[in-house]
Amino acid sequence: MAEFVRAQIFGTTFEITSRYTDLQPVGMGAFGLVCSAKDQLTSQAVAIKKIMKPFSTPVLSKRTYRELKLLKHLRHENIISLSDIFISPLEDIYFVTELLGTDLHRLLTSRPLEKQFIQYFLYQILRGLKYVHSAGVVHRDLKPSNILVNENCDLKICDFGLARIQDPQMTGYVSTRYYRAPEIMLTWQKYDVEVDIWSAGCIFAEMLEGKPLFPGKDHVNQFSIITELLGTPPDDVIQTICSENTLRFVQSLPKRERQPLSNKFKNAEPQAVDLLENMLVFDPKKRVRAEQALAHPYLAPYHDPTDEPIAEEKFDWSFNDADLPVDTWKIMMYSEILDYHNVDAAAQEQENNGS
C-alpha cells in the first residue's frame, strides 16, 4: 500500500504518495488544482492535477473518466502524457503528467514572438491535431493557455477534459469565446474536427499580431467581429443554422465582404497569410485539415510526412452516451487506474528484460 502525505495548498488538501515532494501551486482550473512537484523515482519535475470531488455527481464522474481514458489513449510527442495516476484515501483523483515551464498564453503576453518560433509552434500544434483527429477525438477547447511549452520550445497540447467524439450531432458551448469556431456559435450542433483548425488559426493569428484576433465581448459581438474581417457567411453555411433565433440574427446583419488578410497582417510573410486564409474559413467543409496544413509551404522547414504519426487505433467512445450512477463510474475509474498500473508495470518489466 502506498504511503500518503498531506499538504495544504490554497486551502485545499493535497493528499499524494510519498513518491512526490516539493509541492508548489502552479494553477487553478474550474475542475482542479495543479501543483508542480519532484518525482523521487525519476528525479523529474512533474505536474500533479487534483480533480476536485470527482465522484460528487454523475456528470463530474463521467468527465473525469473521459479525461482519464483520453490521457491513457493519446500517446504523441505534442500531447501531454500521463506518468502516474492514483486515488487518495479521501477519494480524490490525481493525474501526474510531465511539467513544462510555461504556456503559450504567458509567452504571448510577455513579448512578441519571433517568426521562426511562430512557425515551429504552429507546426507542433498541427502535428498534435493530426494525431488527435486521427484517433476520432476533437479537442474543442484549444486556446493559448492549453498549449504548454518548455525551454527547448517543445510544445504539448493539454486539457482534454472537454474533448468529445467526432459526431455529426455534437452539441455544446465549450471553448473560450475568442477561439470558438463559428459553427459552434451558429448551430450548437453538427460540428467536427474542423473546430480545432479554426481555434488553431485564431492562435496562429495571435502569434503573428501579439493580440487576440476576435476579442468578442459576448456571442453576438464575437460573431460581428468575425464578419467584419471574414465577411458574411455564405448562404449554404447560413442554411445549416438550426436555431431559428440564430438564423434571424445572422440574416439581420448587414452584408459584408471578406477582407484580404494581407491587409490586416501587413508584417507577416505571404505564405503565413495564405495558410491563415485556409484555416479561417466559414464553411467547415472547406477549412484546411491538419495534415493538409502540415504540407503547406509555410511549414516546409519542419514538415516531414514520415514523422507526423497518426493514432494506431480510434478512441473507444462507447461509454460516452452512458447515463450511469456515480458508484458505477467509480468502479470503472478504479478499473482503468488498475489497468494503467498493470500495463505500466508490464512495459517496465519488458524494458528491463530487454536492456
Curated annotation (Swiss-Prot):
A GO MF term: ATP binding
Motif annotated as TXY, chain positions: 171-173
InterPro entries in the record: Kinase-like_dom_sf (IPR011009), MAP_kinase (IPR050117), MAP_kinase_CS (IPR003527), MAPK_p38-like (IPR008352), MAPK_Sty1/Hog1 (IPR038783), Prot_kinase_dom (IPR000719), Protein_kinase_ATP_BS (IPR017441), Ser/Thr_kinase_AS (IPR008271)
Regulation of its activity: Activated by tyrosine and threonine phosphorylation.
Cofactor(s) the record lists: Mg(2+)
Documented EC number(s): 2.7.11.24
Catalytic activity: L-seryl-[protein] + ATP = O-phospho-L-seryl-[protein] + ADP + H(+); L-threonyl-[protein] + ATP = O-phospho-L-threonyl-[protein] + ADP + H(+)
Keyword Nucleotidyltransferase: no
Main subcellular location: cytoplasm
Keywords of this entry: Activator, ATP-binding, Cytoplasm, Kinase, Nucleotide-binding, Nucleus, Phosphoprotein, Serine/threonine-protein kinase, Transcription, Transcription regulation, Transferase
Enzyme class, UniProt record, top EC level: transferase
Any one GO biological process: stress-activated MAPK cascade
Modified residues (Phosphotyrosine): Y173
Binding site for ATP: V26, G27, M28, G29, A30, F31, G32, L33, V34, K49
Active site (catalytic residues): D141
Similarity section: Belongs to the protein kinase superfamily. Ser/Thr protein kinase family. MAP kinase subfamily. HOG1 sub-subfamily.
Domain description: The TXY motif contains the threonine and tyrosine residues whose phosphorylation activates the MAP kinases.
Function, in words: Proline-directed serine/threonine-protein kinase involved in a signal transduction pathway that is activated by changes in the osmolarity of the extracellular environment. Controls osmotic regulation of transcription of target genes.
Name the UniProt record assigns to this protein: Mitogen-activated protein kinase HOG1
Lineage: Eukaryota, Fungi, Dikarya, Ascomycota, Pezizomycotina
